[in-house]
Amino acid sequence: MAAGSAADGREGAAVHARAFLYRHAGWLLPLAFAVLVTLLGQWWSPEAFDPDEGINLGKGALVAAGYHPYAEIWNDQPPVLTYILAGVQTVVPWSVGAARVAILAFACLLLFSVFVLVERSAGRAEAVAAIILLGTAPLMWRLSISVMIGLPAVALAVAACAIVYGRDRAAPWRAVAAGLVFALSLQTKLFTAAALPAFLMMAYLADEAGPRGRRAATAATALAATVAGFVAIAWASGEPFLAQLIGPHVAGAVRSDYSFIVTAGHFAEHLVQQPFVVIAALLALTPAGRPAGRLRLAWLAWLGVAAVSLLGHTPLRYHHMLLLLVPLVCLGGEASWRVLRAAWPARWRLARYRTALAVIVPVVAVAYLVLMIRPFHDDETPGVNEAAERLAAHAVADPWVATDQPFDAFVAGLLVPPELVVFSIKRIETGNLTPEMLLATIAARKPGQVMLRRTHADRTVRDYLERTYVPLDPRRLHYLRPDLAN
């Protein structure tokens, strides 16, 4: 009797534990994601995961030092993440890890918001499937601790959708709040404009029992709040919208290289790197997996507009695909659960294959785990950033360095001249950064150090540096101002 009671107690505790995990999956799964990324991802890598990390960190450091994000800094992106990184820099100076923690917080917000939306529109089990798909996507792992603007922008866009799409009657304050959050998304990275039609559809669908007029008013309120928030941020930050935020991305020098075939090839290449997301999304095309959730049309709108936008963009880079990943996991999460539920009654048929499954399932699981963490382990990660250490050796004497790798400068605790902190290939290709501009900035600012190790240095620039600076490392084109060499 006692043994039976103990067994019943253990079984009851297990049932309660499973119920607790299922009931609170919305925040437990993002928390588990953060823990796994912290344990498996190379958080404290002294090298940048992407060149854009250095640009964003450098801009944040300059704004924290009192520089205007547009009047003094050449900047072709919206300002929200720059302001956030400036705040991080103020609280925890020169910490790459702290900045990556901020991005991981946005990743958790994205996972939670996806869960909320899918749960409200399709069900809790479908939401768990969607969040697992997104949380195990290799792209999500890579971007979750890369100091880049795409993930925060997408996270804010999905959060805005989660705010506006409630179970109960839509309230005006919710539409206003959602619109303001979507404005923050746009002012983080403009590519989330592709999600705007889906956002407005969700605002319209939020009050399904209400009359059409009231639903249209909710969508109009959300749109008005988005426009008002966007304009307010643009005005407060003084952003040159057409000249710098739009112009460099549609310049003739960039568009002349556009090829649909090449872009479509990159599109397919980046997409197949998220295999389980693609497979789950394809299940939505099957009769058993066809989504029936209330937001399926909104997700299809997001997917379609995003796909067209990305196929028309040049250059298309891997991190742009996150915009496509959100609707794919939401549709795929529902579809995969519906297929599993439809196949469950026939599960006994798998018994004859249990030996093969006992081998195949663990192999697939391990292979997928390796695929997830591969972005962090493609190459042997160095223990130190040698270039940053060389810069840091002379950092006390002068806090400035002109460099084409601002990540090195940030790790060394140095500022990059505001005219040069956005040292990107696109800026060079569009003529917004020429050798003459580089030379003029170095001559005017007279930074304590110059290091050009990422891009080709013009002969004129080299000659000037040889005449006016002391060479320290020819391989990295590292130069020191003469008065600091004594």
Regions found by a protein language model. Name each.
Residues Q77, F191-T192, V364-N486:
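Extracytoplasmic
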Residues E119-A125, V158-A177, A209, V277-L295, ...:
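Membrane-interface transmembrane helices that cradle and orient dolichyl/undecaprenyl
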Residues A130-I131, R174-L190, L196-M201, A224-A225, ...:
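Membrane-interface alpha helices of multi-pass inner-membrane proteins
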Residues S5-D8, G12, A171, A195-T226, ...:
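Perimembrane helix-loop-helix junctions
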Residues V101-A122:
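Transmembrane-helix motifs of polytopic, lipid-linked glycan transferases
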Residues S113, L133, P152-R169, A177-F182, ...:
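Specific aromatic-rich, kink-prone transmembrane helix
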Residues F112, H270-A307, G332:
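Hydrophobic, aromatic-rich transmembrane alpha-helices
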Residues R142-P152, R317-Y318:
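Short acidic/glycine- and proline-prone juxtamembrane loop motifs at membrane-interface regions
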